[in-house]
Curated annotation (Swiss-Prot):
This is Abnormal cell lineage protein 44. PANTHER family: ABNORMAL CELL LINEAGE PROTEIN 44, WNT RELATED. One of its GO terms (molecular function) is cytokine activity. Glycans are attached at residue 286. Palmitoleoylation is required for efficient binding to frizzled receptors. Depalmitoleoylation leads to Wnt signaling pathway inhibition. Coiled coil: none annotated. Keywords: Developmental protein, Disulfide bond, Extracellular matrix, Glycoprotein, Lipoprotein, Secreted, Signal, Wnt signaling pathway. GO terms for biological process: asymmetric cell division; canonical Wnt signaling pathway; cell fate commitment; cell fate specification involved in pattern specification; establishment or maintenance of cell polarity; interneuron migration; motor neuron migration; nematode male tail tip morphogenesis. Ligand for members of the frizzled family of seven transmembrane receptors. Affects male tail development, vulval precursor cell specification and egg laying. Involved in morphogenesis by influencing polarity of asymmetric cell divisions of the B, U, and F cells in the male, and the T cell in males and hermaphrodites. Controls spindle orientation in B-gamma cell division during male copulatory spicule development. Involved in specification of the P7.p lineage during vulval development. Expressed in the tail hypodermis. Residues 1-25 form the signal peptide. Belongs to the Wnt family. The gene is lin-44.
């Protein structure tokens, strides 16, 4: 069964907490008590970035560049990998009411079957993986957790200028290109489409950049302003690429496409025949028969409705200064899920 939207947000990989904190930190970096004016202290590096690459990446057969980078820049590879994982989860949440929902696409660093085909869905996974890898590395850079990133001040002080880190964005984009682009591969039409969509993903990072500024001066006056570019949230980047996916273009040798377009080579197989929809949560009261409608989402296999009683936090309020106090409430839920049979294909 698919998780409810808010439950889904908290079901993530080993670095989910790291990325949540990073997103908060890069959006509004707090002043650390006792730190010099205009300075912030770098947050400690998460243990997962200190442990080196796991064996599946260290011995990856899909991408030779992953193997090499694991030996020289493991923190970069792990940040990219976890960024991709986070991106796939965002995609599954974003498309949870569509028949194909990213949930079984697989991480690009593991060479999933979907990326050996030129489907419309493949174009989204290529682009989203590329963008998410760049986002993961840029986010880690902004925190000073990657040693060779220009954002990390290695001058002997565990602090750096409050001015944001535009360098981290470019470092993330460069890392994504080097890690995910296959070098020396056969120059087939599929490979051309793959490279195009990977680049479109990297461009999505640039297209969604956000400008941030901080004023410097006495009593909050803006005598001097420091501005920098930072990455958007991964949710926003995912939304941007999902919209591109909806308008993806069929590619031929004489096609004229923009570098930001997603492109594909062949029609997708029927999702209802290619994969199982059993357990998918659907909207059985959807009278408009649009997104999430059980009749459409369940491919005509029918659906089941069950009643759940869950305990949730409610009526939350902050108690000065820093405690969040909530009541425990009982909530009744009627959940409809698709019936179905095992999948007939491993592609989706």
């Amino acid at each position: 069964m698919r998780a409810a939207p808010f439950d889904f947000f908290f079901q993530s990989t080993a670095l989910s907490t790291f990325f949540i904190l990073c997103s908060l930190a890069t959006n509004e970096i707090p002043t650390i008590s006792g730190a010099p004016a205009g300075k912030i202290v770098q947050p400690p590096k998460p243990n997962i970035l200190k442990q080196g690459c796991p064996s599946d990446l260290l011995h990856s057969r899909a991408l030779r560049s992953i193997q090499l980078a694991c030996r020289t820049h493991p923190a970069t590879v792990i940040s990219a990998f976890e960024g991709v994982q986070e991106g796939l989860q965002n995609c599954a949440n974003r498309l949870r009411f569509q028949q194909w929902d990213c949930s079984e696409a697989g991480n690009i660093m593991h060479d999933p079957p979907l990326l050996r085909q030129g489907f419309r869905e493949s174009s989204l996974i290529w682009a989203l993986s590329s963008a998410s890898a760049a986002w993961g590395v840029a986010t880690a850079c902004a925190q000073g957790w990657i040693d060779d990133c220009a954002c990390n001040n290695q001058m002997g002080q565990n602090e750096y200028e409050f001015g944001g880190c535009t360098h981290g964005v470019q470092h993330g984009i460069t890392a994504s290109r080097k890690l995910l682009t296959k070098v020396g591969a056969v120059n087939t039409l599929l490979r051309k489409v793959e490279k195009h969509n990977l680049k479109a993903g990297r461009l999505a990072i640039k297209k969604t950049l956000i400008s941030s500024c901080k004023c410097h001066g006495v009593s909050g006056s803006c005598q001097q302003k420091t501005c920098w570019k930072r990455t958007a949230t991964l949710e926003h980047i995912t939304d941007y690429l999902v919209e591109k996916y909806a308008r993806a273009k069929l590619y031929t040798d004489d096609s004229v496409v923009k570098t930001t377009d997603l492109i594909y080579l062949e029609a997708s197989p029927d999702v209802c025949k290619a994969k199982s929809v059993a357990g998918r949560v659907c909207a059985w009261r959807n009278e408009t028969h649009t997104q999430g409608d059980c009749d459409r989402l369940c491919c005509g296999n029918g659906f089941s409705i069950r009643h759940e009683v869950v305990r949730v936090k409610c009526d939350c309020e902050f108690v000065w200064c820093c405690n969040l106090v909530c009541k425990d409430c009982i909530q009744h839920r009627w959940i409809s899920t698709c019936n179905g049979t095992p999948p007939k294909s491993l592609i989706f």
